[in-house]
Curated annotation (Swiss-Prot):
This is Transmembrane protein 201. Coiled coil: none annotated. Residues 610-628 have a biased composition (Polar residues). It holds the Pfam family Ima1_N. Keywords: Acetylation, Angiogenesis, Membrane, Nucleus, Phosphoprotein, Transmembrane, Transmembrane helix. Belongs to the TMEM201 family.
Amino acid sequence: MEGVSALLASCPTAGLAGGLGVTACAAAGVVLYRIARRVKPTHTMVNCWFCNHDTLVPYGNRNCWDCPHCEQYNGFQENGDYNKPIPAQYMEHLNHVVSSVPSPRDPAQPQQWVSSQVLLCRRCSHHQTTKIKQLAAFTPREEGRYDEEIEVYRHHLEQMYKLCRPCQAAVEYYIKHQNRQLRALLLSHQFRRREADQAHGQSFSSSAVKAPFQVILLRALAFLACAFLLFTTLYGPSEPFTPGAALPPALPPGGNSSAASDNTTSQAEGWQQLLGLLPEHATEKLHEAWAFGQSHQTSIVAVGLLTCLLAMLLAGRIRLRRIDAFSTCLWALLLGLHLAEHYLQAASPGWLDTLKFSTTSLCCLVGFTAAVATRKSTGPRRFRPRRYFSGDSASLFPSSPSLAVPYPSVTSSPASLFIPTPPGFLPLTKQQLFRSPRRVSPSSLPGRLSRALSLGTIPPLTRTDSGYLFSGSRPPSRVSPAGEVSLSDYFSLLSSSFPASPLPSPAPSVASSVASSSGSLRHRRPLISPARLNLKGQKLLLFSSPGEAPNTPSSSEEFSPPNGSLFIESPQLPQRNHTRDTKHTMEMRSMLARDSARSSHSIKKEDESSQSSTCVVDTTTKGCSEETTPWKARVSPSLVRGLLAVSLAVNALFTSAYLYQSLR
């Protein structure tokens, strides 16, 4: 050590360089040792090119691996192509079908709900969004067949992305709840619109019934023209404005001659005194007007007819009255009589003068009535019900505000009306699941309506409160194993109906829709016109007679209409036992015979006890039989009114003829 110290003291630079060299050699040795003893990584984190998800893969497969999220292969060359051939790109049998139904090996996971305001779970909501996006990005193979191809593609997506059973039950329950609210809203809207129409009609009629002043003036002018014609007919060729003129006799000849002459003399003196009060030029004008009118009677009749027609046109359709039309007809008849007299100047018959005088008198009377009665009668109109569709019949609307049913207010926001808050259905699972379904008796009102309104299919005699208008409108449910009750069946049990059938639902029928609304059948109109029913001559036995006891079958009996109007369609299931099928056939035949006998007995009993007329509803619009129809139903009200008008005209004609003969 002493020698080394002496050497370093004699050469300090060499000692420093030697120390640095030793340190460098030691560091290099350590680095080489670490490189030699380095352990290669077993896994590495890679990023998917397609879905951008990070995945941990073995280190050797960092450029050839399948993404577990999108199932796409990631292995590329420098030019961007795949680094190996992929047969699944061009071989169909190597691809598996993509479906939203979870595989059986996946563990059952609890439902994840987005929020309390969304009916669908997170998975079903994502599937709905996917369907919408795929439909939006759809490109047809042929542009001319776009509609057909997109319908097929939509059906394919519906089959691929089906809703889970809880979501399907929730959607059906929500649709039912929404239909109830919208039905009540529509009913309230129709009732308020009817009240508004009635109020508007009353205000409009009160303002429009009063005739305008021009119409009243024209009616008065027509009456004055007819009165002038009547006076010219009474005076004849004489002139009342001459100094020695007298009034026509007011009493018929053959009575007390002295009293009649005294009365005529007093009237002539009074008329002369009245003419003396008028100035001379006024008397001359009256004389000229009288002479002109007496020589132009046909023109005055034409002017009166035109005046009546103009008054009717100015009055309009609302103010048109029967008396105006009758007055116009009388003016037309009077014009025809004057024209006939004008063309028969050589030999004018005596009956023509009598008929002309009678018509003029009647026209004067009718014209005076039309001129005085300036307001149309505003009596209460008889309500004419209208036919409403989509389930809201006119008989549902109350006829008075006191009978109105309280409905939700329409003044609220549109979102709360047409998108109501979905009711909670998960707490309902605590209630009793299995309830005994109600069996409707064939003798009850739904059974009778189902038997009368059947169109050839078997109607279920239970309520189908599933939110659909017809029982066949709901989609067919999937077959479930025995002992398994779905959530949709549970909601159908809560609404007092049968569980969803494992078989496809039948076609929509009117009878099932009638049976679905059995609680309000007395206040609804049928959904189909009676002219289109096919009842094959059966009587519509909706209500039993007072002395008839309701026939309620046992729980093992099923309803079957008689006379073969309906046929039983048994579901086509696999045959298990021939003896069981034979026994079932015998039971069905016995039920058919028993129900037929019961129906014929009820029909015969009702025919004996009922004294009212029965109406047979057929496939055509024939009413009741002619033997039971009263005579008042055959005679229309218009015919009765016409007979009354003819009787009034004949009476007035004979009265005018009598007056004319008496005055002459």
